[in-house]
Amino acid sequence: MSSALIKCLNLAKTVGNATVRSFLAAPKQPWQSCSAAALQTPHVQMPMQMHTSAVRRDLMEFFDDKKNWSENEVKVGRAWRTEELRIKSNKELHQLWFVLLKERNMLLTMEHECNDKMEVFPSPERIDKVKISMENLETVVRERNKAYHLLETGETGERPQKAVKNAFGLQVSYKACEHALPPFMNLKWIKSRNIGYGGRAVNRFLLKYREKLYNAKRKAKNRSRNEVMMILRRNPNFDLDVLRRQFPDVNVDKLRNEDKIRGHYVPKVGV
Amino acid sequence: MNNCIKVVPIALRCQQRTISTSSVLEGKRNFRKFNAYNKRGTRVVKEAQKTLANPPVAIHKRGVRDTGILVDGQYVEIPEKIPDIIVPDLTGCKLKPYVSYKAPDVVQSEFTSLDLFNAVYSQKIIEDFKAGKLQKDGSAKEPSVNEQLTPEEALQRARKTGSDIF
């Protein structure tokens, strides 16, 4: 049985090698993006093509330009915004992703090397800019993915989420993921999961936690009410509509009938 | 004076500073306190890591995934497990990692399924409507390749190997 399995796997390896060879022998065609939204655009299914960057036999692409090595500051622009990335095509987004990936690898390499050599790493905020650009790029790809799924299947195509309670009794959002085994066969998961939460300690924790949340809310409400009180006390002719719009939680009309908004002065009687 | 000369070595020896340490702990005795990854540890540990099906310390692969499986102690490579990284051709690429602060502002809303429908389907529907090639339920008499796409096929196409899962 195992020897037969080994033979099957070796045969699969041979077929795989033949496939790769046929891919390499295929005539060069422009590369097509594998993004879900781009699958709609070409009317014919293009065969899978492979590309690599230019071969460089050293690792100097992981390091910055030599003239920047001893600088205290490297001037660069800002991160890519979501609006700017939305006007790019899928191919351009793919290229930009790898440009940002190379930049990130270069920056991390330089940071590590500067730490080793006890030197100043110039402009460390570049790492944050590259990270923001990558996050925005993923946001745009996700938008297009969702648009494709909504148009063709009626669903968003993202992983379904479920609200579950963790061991402390707090509600967290669980994103489903794929498993090789069905749940009833997954012995490791069955043994490791704890069905439900409980115990006196959890109940006491939840009581204190909710009390903490309630106290925060109560203090915020009291703070707003006190602020309105002081405004009316110092400025008796304040515009009440502005107060109602700015402090929706406070009952301004009820507050006006109370003595709290009366100031330290004698009201002016008609002379 | 002779007495002083005789006493000098003793005095110097008394003034010498000494240190003391605890006994040296060999690795074999307190194995649990050491991080013994792939090539660390004693010879016996390395042999066990190499031969046992479930080694005492898990093999540290540094985040790299396997491209095959072990069958009866023999490593078999599986072609489907080898990652196929699709890298675009960056020659002539004008995009840079940063955007100049002088760049003009861009206003562009989110790409929605309606935009995708307008880009792909609406032109053909308009032409079919003008030519009278629509059926009573609104579908086309001569559907294009995109119109023949069923939801299952579209989902399969989107969920091919290498697609993003959000």
Swiss-Prot record, chain B:
It comes from the Eukaryota. Component of the mitochondrial ribosome large subunit (39S) which comprises a 16S rRNA and about 50 distinct proteins. This is Large ribosomal subunit protein mL41. Belongs to the mitochondrion-specific ribosomal protein mL41 family. PANTHER family: LARGE RIBOSOMAL SUBUNIT PROTEIN ML41 (PTHR21338:SF0), MITOCHONDRIAL RIBOSOMAL PROTEIN L41 (PTHR21338). Residues 1-26 form a transit peptide. Its main location: mitochondrion. Keywords: Mitochondrion, Ribonucleoprotein, Ribosomal protein, Transit peptide. One of its GO terms (biological process) is translation. One of its GO terms (cellular component) is mitochondrial large ribosomal subunit. It is found in: Mitochondrion. Pfam families: MRP-L27. GO terms for molecular function: structural constituent of ribosome. Residues 136-166 are annotated as: Disordered. InterPro entries: Ribosomal_mL41.
